[in-house]
Amino acid sequence: MRIEAASPQGDRLAQCLWNAQCLLLDVLKFDVAADKLVSRYLREHRELGPRDRHVVAETVFAVLRQKRVFSHLAQSGGGTLERRLVLLGARCCTTDAGLQAAIAEDEWTWISQVSTVDTRTLPAAVRSNLTDEWFAQLTEAYGETDALALAEALNTAAPLDIRINTIKSSRAAVRVEFNTAPFDRATCALAPLGLRLKGKPALQKTDIFTSGAIEVQDEGSQLLTHLLGAKRGEMVADFCAGAG
């Protein structure tokens, strides 16, 4: 779906926000997995540079992660609801100075006002960014404090964990390899073959990835494979649900 207004000219961030708004209209239908829609949109808009793509994608995902809080805050203000959600999401991946320069004065005034809201005063279910029903079930199982902590973890962008393929390399060797590359890494706390990378480095472009020496796998899944204790001739299938 496309919004009626034309793409703004000039300011790159303003164009990113326009693209994020177009994309969000489709994503909020929730009839296709969000990551697929984002990937398709970025493929169709090759004029967007790497930084632009990052802003568009992260703005949309920020809205999805914090949709209930953002929707609460976006009850006020002018323009469309999707526009207000995009402005809130953009604050998660842009600077205030850059955002202020890219949007209208009244939009910045609104952003500044809602930013003063203490979200800790909102109802617990709203703060969790979950439905009332789901939050009630978590609260019944774990108590409100732990339910909120779990919800916060679920709504936080996952770190990038990799698993070393011991047939082709070792964790020590991979650590040395990353010492020569622009990667900030740390040993996974529990998984014996895991490393955790900070940020979202372009692993696909590295020789160590294309050679099969490492694979992307979260630490929890790595631990499950060890707990299963697969023997020679057995296989563990790790089905990834992704954003679906």
Residue ranges and their predicted role:
Residues 1-205:
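Class I Rossmann-like S-adenosyl-L-methionine
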Residues 206-207, 226-232:
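Glycine-rich helix-loop-beta junction characteristic of Rossmann-like nucleotide cofactor-binding loops
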Residues 138, 162, 216, 224, ...:
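Conserved hydrophobic/aromatic pocket- or pore-lining residues that grip, position, or stack substrates
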Residues 160, 222, 234:
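Glycine-centered loop/turn positions within well-structured domains
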Residues 233-240:
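Conserved class I S-adenosyl-L-methionine
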Residues 244:
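Glycine-rich SAM-binding Motif I of class I
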Residues 208-214:
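Class I SAM-dependent methyltransferase Rossmann-like catalytic core
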Residues 202, 221-222:
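Short, glycine-/Ser/Thr-/acidic-enriched flexible segments
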